[in-house]
A protein has these predicted regions:
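Glycine-rich ATP phosphate-binding loop
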Residues: 98-120
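Structural motif in protein kinase domains
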Residues: 163-179, 305, 337
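Protein kinase catalytic-loop region centered on the HRD/HxD motif
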Residues: 199-213
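Activation segment/activation loop of eukaryotic-type protein kinase catalytic domains
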Residues: 216-273, 310
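C-terminal lobe substrate-recognition/regulatory segment of protein kinase catalytic domains
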Residues: 324-371
Length: 410
């Protein structure tokens, strides 16, 4: 589940006046379950005007004041607990799919990943209470569960269950052995696509949150592939909501973004996965998640990176190659171009008609016009049907339909 090398920023001191004092809950509740980049960075951080600034989470709205009012308490950790679990934050950071620093540790007898995130805007107590409760109550087999949180100063610390495995980007493109992939069969990739579609549909429509809930971090680095079973789980569920990345309709209106006395808010994204409208305005919607999922579909079919740069010997610089542009070229040319584009490490063993349908679906999801992108519920249904077609194909030609693979380095 690790590919990015993370740089830790010193965590705020627990003695800071702005830090919230968080007491452990009175009763215990348990909840279920890198390589060096040689090319220009794909991390994207445009600046957009906003009326917000860097916010601290004051003791007035601290999580400790919320825990007693939550009918099913998430774990509200004391800051001293996470400090002890991470050896006062001196423990080697866990290399994860996030651009924020994280640690693998044990809290209250449970192995987890602790992420340090900075608040992006002020979140009032009732709003944070509603978000935290709904997110921690949510359960789906394809979504990594948020177990609890704590706050200190400008930071929120989010504790997610630890999943044994590797991220999808590493499974598709092993930096130590590019010619090898654990996802060497078509059916294994369709299983991954189905799991992600199921999980994202749940996040958008069934998680108990509002009808416009957005994940905002969908990419191959943010998908964990479990060891042995090769199932996919979506990471960072609820991060955008709890950190204040998602601005509501009122707060995101054009008049607010046009105020001359506005501050500048940094909007972060990953090149190759950002929808055009997000790049233009910094505002994210569910259709931005659909766009990012479409990119992941194209990655699964081709094995290619969402965006890469290769050295152009003729021009003396770097040439940009987008998986979306390549997919559009393949569709435009037609004929045998699809067979040339599909990941050769699957050894030409896949149902061609299903591969064509997956290519079409991926391109629909990355349409430049968000109104033309399908809803995630429709996408989930189509991917599930294509998975069944793939399974029937595999059974007819006698291929195994169950997977048990080690993700250890090769």
């Amino acid at each position: 589940m690790a590919t990015e090398s993370l740089k830790s920023t010193p965590p705020p001191s627990s003695s800071s006046s702005s830090s919230s004092t968080i007491n452990p809950p009175s009763s215990t509740h348990k909840y279920p379950s890198t390589s060096t980049n040689k090319y220009p960075s794909t991390n994207y951080s445009p600046n957009y005007p906003s009326t917000s600034k860097s916010w601290s989470f004051s003791s007035k709205t601290s999580l400790s004041n919320l825990k007693d009012s939550l009918p099913e308490n998430p774990h509200i950790y004391d800051f001293s607990e996470i400090s002890k679990a991470t050896n006062n934050f001196l423990q080697k950071p866990f290399s994860s799919s996030s651009s924020s620093v994280s640690w693998r540790c044990s809290l209250r007898g449970k192995e987890l990943i602790l992420f340090q995130r900075k608040f992006r805007r002020q979140i009032e107590s009732p709003e944070l209470q509603q978000r935290l409760l709904a997110i921690c109550r949510s359960h789906h087999s394809s979504v990594i569960k948020l177990l609890g949180a704590t706050t200190s100063g400008n930071y929120i610390y989010l504790a997610y269950e630890y999943v044994h495995g590797a991220n999808l980007a590493t499974c598709l493109r092993n930096p130590q052995n590019p010619s090898y992939t654990v996802l060497s069969s078509w059916l294994s990739r369709m299983q991954i696509a189905t799991d992600i579609a199921n999980g994202l549909d749940y996040i958008h429509h069934c998680s108990g949150l509002n009808s416009e809930f957005v994940h905002n971090h969908i990419k191959s680095l943010s998908i964990s592939v479990t060891e042995d079973s090769l199932n996919a789980k979506i990471c960072h569920f609820g991060t955008a909501e709890l950190c204040g990345e998602i601005v509501g309709k009122e707060g995101s209106s054009s008049k607010n973004f046009g105020r001359s006395n506005s501050k500048v808010m940094k909007i972060e994204g990953t090149r190759g996965y950002m929808a055009p409208e997000f790049q233009a305005s910094g505002l994210t919607t569910q259709k931005c998640d659909v766009y990012a999922f479409g990119v992941v579909i194209l990655e699964l079919v081709s094995g290619e990176e969402a965006l890469r740069y290769v050295f152009d010997e003729g021009g003396g610089g770097y040439k940009r190659i987008s998986v979306i542009e390549r997919a559009r070229e393949v569709m435009a040319v037609g004929g045998g171009e699809l067979r040339k584009w599909v990941d050769k490490r699957m050894k030409d063993s896949y149902p061609v008609e299903v591969a064509e349908k997956m290519l079409l679906l991926g391109l629909e999801c990355v349409d430049d016009d968000p109104e033309k992108r399908p809803d995630m519920g429709l996408v989930d249904g189509r991917v599930s049907r294509l998975y069944l077609e793939s399974k029937n194909w595999a059974e007819k030609i006698g291929l195994p339909t169950d997977f048990s693979v080690s993700l250890a380095p090769r």
